[in-house]
């Protein structure tokens, strides 16, 4: 197909499918991270397209912290059953035994033990040499400078000064024994691109992205949804019901909602057209300290 005749979204789709196929052909044991969010849903859709009518030739991996929204887990299991892909779910057993909680131990320690260490455990356990992730460059400044092929050493750490040039959509996937890469097929997409593609391709998403009246607590300027009985209220806090939706999804105590009436995809797209902030502003883990995300990525986080 003539690239000049492709729409903007078709060009992004073609680029992403090319990257997914390249990795599947070049690496021995790839895996696709499945965080259940909108970007993961788009990436899964692209992987299905890349190998249609065949089955996706690698498993999907969800690192479960035990603190995801209930609707996320329900959606994950329903989606795996619907499409029949190989789904691996990993929880850090040491973290579970320690009873790690974002309420008790804070966002930084919770993220390190349950997400970063849990991810590294799963990658080591299965010997994966390439892991797809749904991160985009427009989300956050450390992700903006990350390559499509993001090289990691034997400890899964990221050195932004030790990455390879990617000229003319050519990727060098050569790694030494014990090294691996993280791959980001959606690097050049924006949040608006994601929503427009979801709408045009009729991709299923977690209902939490759509506005609805839900129980929330206003904590330090963030609207935290009360998702289960483990929600710990601080002195002076009270539960209110507000029309909210989520621009990003993670562990429920660490993910802020936005007040919104947008309960259809066209209404969400309309909101995105006038949005002036990144969706990551609703993630508490990004505000632990200055450069917080880059520090986490250097330690092995996605």
From Swiss-Prot:
CDD domains: Sulfate_adenylyltransferase_2. GO terms for biological process: hydrogen sulfide biosynthetic process; sulfate assimilation. Residues 280-302 have a biased composition (Basic and acidic residues). InterPro entries: PAPS_reduct_dom (IPR002500), Rossmann-like_a/b/a_fold (IPR014729), SO4_adenylTrfase_ssu (IPR011784), Sulfate_adenylyltrnsfr_sub2 (IPR050128). The keyword Transferase applies. Keywords: ATP-binding, Nucleotide-binding, Nucleotidyltransferase, Transferase. Pfam families: PAPS_reduct. One of its GO terms (molecular function) is ATP binding. It catalyses: sulfate + ATP + H(+) = adenosine 5'-phosphosulfate + diphosphate. Pathway: Sulfur metabolism; hydrogen sulfide biosynthesis; sulfite from sulfate: step 1/3. Residues 279-302 are annotated as: Disordered. Its EC number is 2.7.7.4. It is an enzyme of class 2 (transferase). Belongs to the PAPS reductase family. CysD subfamily. PANTHER family: SULFATE ADENYLYLTRANSFERASE SUBUNIT 2. With CysN forms the ATP sulfurylase (ATPS) that catalyzes the adenylation of sulfate producing adenosine 5'-phosphosulfate (APS) and diphosphate, the first enzymatic step in sulfur assimilation pathway. APS synthesis involves the formation of a high-energy phosphoric-sulfuric acid anhydride bond driven by GTP hydrolysis by CysN coupled to ATP hydrolysis by CysD. Heterodimer composed of CysD, the smaller subunit, and CysN. This is Sulfate adenylyltransferase subunit 2. It comes from Aliivibrio salmonicida (strain LFI1238).
């Amino acid at each position: 197909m003539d690239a000049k005749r492709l729409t903007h979204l078709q060009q992004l789709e073609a680029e992403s499918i090319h990257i997914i196929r390249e990795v599947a052909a070049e690496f021995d044991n790839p895996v696709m991270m499945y965080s259940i969010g909108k970007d993961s849903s788009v990436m899964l859709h692209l992987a299905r397209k890349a190998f249609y009518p065949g089955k996706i030739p690698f498993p999907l991996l969800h690192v479960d912290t035990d603190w995801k929204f209930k609707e996320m887990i329900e959606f994950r299991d329903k989606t795996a059953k619907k499409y029949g892909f190989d789904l691996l779910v990993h929880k850090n057993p040491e973290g579970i035994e320690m009873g790690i909680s974002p309420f008790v131990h804070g966002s930084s320690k919770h993220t390190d033990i349950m997400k970063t260490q849990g991810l590294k455990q799963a990658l080591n356990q299965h010997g994966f040499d390439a892991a797809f992730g749904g991160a985009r460059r427009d989300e956050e400044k450390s992700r903006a400078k990350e390559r499509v092929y993001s090289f990691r050493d034997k400890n899964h750490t990221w050195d932004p000064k030790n990455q390879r040039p990617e000229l003319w959509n050519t990727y060098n996937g050569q790694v030494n024994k014990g090294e691996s890469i993280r791959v980001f097929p959606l690097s050049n997409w924006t949040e608006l691109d994601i929503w427009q593609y979801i709408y045009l391709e009729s991709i299923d998403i977690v209902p939490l992205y759509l506005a609805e009246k839900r129980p929330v607590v206003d904590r330090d300027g963030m609207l935290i949804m009360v998702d289960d009985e483990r929600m710990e209220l601080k002195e002076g806090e009270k539960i209110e019901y507000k029309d909210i939706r989520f621009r990003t999804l993670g562990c429920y105590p660490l993910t802020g909602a936005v007040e919104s009436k947008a309960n259809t995809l066209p209404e969400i797209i309309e909101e995105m057209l006038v949005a002036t902030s990144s969706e990551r502003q609703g993630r508490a883990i990004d505000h632990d300290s200055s450069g917080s995300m880059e520090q986490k990525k250097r330690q092995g986080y996605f």
